[in-house]
Amino acid sequence: MTILNHTLGFPRVGLRRELKKAQESYWAGNSTREELLAVGRELRARHWDQQKQAGIDLLPVGDFAWYDHVLTTSLLLGNVPARHQNNDGSVDIDTLFRIGRGRAPTGEPAAAAEMTKWFNTNYHYMVPEFVKGQQFKLTWTQLLEEVDEALALGHKVKPVLLGPVTYLWLGKVKGEQFDRLSLLNDILPVYQQVLAELAKRGIEWVQIDEPALVLELPQAWLDAYKPAYDALQGQVKLLLTTYFEGVTPNLDTITALPVQGLHVDLVHGKDDVAELHKRLPSEWLLSAGLINGRNVWRADLTEKYAQIKDIVGKRDLWVASSCSLLHSPIDLSVETRLDAEVKSWFAFALQKCHELALLRDALNSGDTAALAAWSAPIQARRHSTRVHNPAVEKRLAAITAQDSQRANVYEVRAEAQRARFKLPAWPTTTIGSFPQTTEIRTLRLDFKKGNLDANNYRTGIAEHIKQAIVEQERLGLDVLVHGEAERNDMVEYFGEHLDGFVFTQNGWVQSYGSRCVKPPIVIGDVSRPAPITVEWAKYAQSLTDKPVKGMLTGPVTILCWSFPREDVSRETIAKQIALALRDEVADLEAAGIGIIQIDEPALREGLPLRRSDWDAYLQWGVEAFRINAAVAKDDTQIHTHMCYCEFNDIMDSIAALDADVITIETSRSDMELLESFEEFDYPNEIGPGVYDIHSPNVPSVEWIEALLKKAAKRIPAERLWVNPDCGLKTRGWPETRAALANMVQAAQNLRRG
């Protein structure tokens, strides 16, 4: 019983973001389709070779995507929304880009498909759309072509396919409502055809991803698995693959399926290996997801060995990454600026492949010396002063309930704030950022590269802040912002100014399409060595008599959009960040800033996958926000901002944040999101976004007025604010000016009644 290893997938973008550059060049019309396809081929060949060199036995094929793997699956099944179809019914790479982006070098532009988070990760997928009576057929053969490519290169491969039940679960019905699960029998023949094609190519194992099996699924969906897999059995061996959580609650459903193996995430799930071994059919292969595919930390391989060794020789066993390595940066070896101590704590995708090779060899031979050597830096990290700050740990331990309570209730605070700010009805504001022009980006880059000294940099930033204040005063906005010219990214900026974070040069991970992010890494206890935002906020306030908002990113969002530590709980990290930012609130207040916004766009997306785990998360998430804000005096107005999300099921928690004003993204839902606030009888003030900042379109005065009147039917007008959906960082100044002028005019019209 030789143990093999494999990965569930590998990052697609390339070490230098080659895929991103090729996509964007093609979209801009600067390169041909052939040139784009050649970059994809080169990246796939390189990534297979790198995994093989690092010691991986079975290489994943089908994990590469031109935009997103769920979208690739939609095309495979011939699921192309009518608005994106070619006239002759054919499907090509431009069809795929039109669905993802709303436009491509050929074909008519049309609204892009909806995009949403892939389970609880920071990757986004394109939501499949289903209509009644839909037909499916094998259309886009990218998977088969890539299998042929890998076989021609002499690789031992394991194709990767998103399973039929999870695919339907991830989609949405458009038009006339019906149960999308009823389409299962219509898509299964396409899956049968694909598996038959793979069998023809001599493929032994197919990784069929069914991550929906870790969720608390409705019974009808659980019941659908057996007939679905009865239809798919027999052509190749199927490795039923789950990740991001454990499978124990759904194990009865799983063990009844006619598959030949099961992959389990032993990092994020609480499954017990001995229990799994006992309950799985004895002839099944167990793929143990022991290496974390979605973090950057070196694994304690001695611990991983101990976790699995008792079942070695008792059943067929593979060792694997917990999930696809898509969520991890590619290669640690190119990081030249991290100091040796910190660097020794990390492992990126290629290093994780090496870990799988070490683990496989030790399990096959029983010799664990190499594992102990690899794990030595982890033991050292446990005692490092870079990790532990006794002052932070002491302060966290001393938190009391009082620390998360404002001095008085909202009604008392609102009166003090009205007396202080004397704002008109329908007060107007923006969410925080203004257009990040080429000049601003060049200024920051020159400073970062050392081509510009600190004095000249500060003079340049001050000038941009001044321009933003002048623009807002000219437009007639009531509450101003400084525009965030000094910030590259709302999380990175704070991470750079807090102790306990480090940054990489090339730690890019794909967010969606061509967008990549470089998340900060939390390596130790978090504290604030000096004020972060106070100086620029104070400068902006000195330029105007109108209130200027202080702008902070909230603790839960900073946590969710970073790579967290693994040696303490997420709750601990969030509360440490909250304490650091609490001091920032106090300093802003002392500097005369009377309105402070704490953005928490990630509060909802941080929810655990299982609803039964929600309460505990929301409890500490809300507490972290309140610790951050509660130091503010009654007449300091605390705002928060949240992006597009379903609020209904977390309204209690949103109200519990006790922000004086919440601004939300509502324009794309035509104010429907306000239903939750109305039904809940939300007591504080609210600014429903009146136009979509993701589009260059300028909304008319009438359109904005109509939306606000609609909002006033649900929320009393005296509690409504007027603002765009989101920050204006990605927009140009011409459409920003035009849209804000119309927004201010609409508010003035409503004041006149």
UniProtKB/Swiss-Prot annotation:
Pathway: Amino-acid biosynthesis; L-methionine biosynthesis via de novo pathway; L-methionine from L-homocysteine (MetE route): step 1/1. L-homocysteine binds at I431, G432, S433, E484, D599. It is an enzyme of class 2 (transferase). Its EC number is 2.1.1.14. Catalyzes the transfer of a methyl group from 5-methyltetrahydrofolate to homocysteine resulting in methionine formation. CDD domains: CIMS_C_terminal_like, CIMS_N_terminal_like. GO terms for biological process: methionine biosynthetic process; methylation. This is 5-methyltetrahydropteroyltriglutamate--homocysteine methyltransferase. Its cofactor is Zn(2+). Binds 1 zinc ion per subunit. Zn(2+) binds at H641, C643, E665, C726. The active site is at H694. Keywords: Amino-acid biosynthesis, Metal-binding, Methionine biosynthesis, Methyltransferase, Repeat, Transferase, Zinc. It comes from the Bacteria. L-methionine binds at I431, G432, S433, E484, D599. GO terms for molecular function: 5-methyltetrahydropteroyltriglutamate-homocysteine S-methyltransferase activity; zinc ion binding. It comes from Escherichia coli O7:K1 (strain IAI39 / ExPEC). Belongs to the vitamin-B12 independent methionine synthase family. It catalyses: 5-methyltetrahydropteroyltri-L-glutamate + L-homocysteine = tetrahydropteroyltri-L-glutamate + L-methionine. Pfam families: Meth_synt_1, Meth_synt_2.
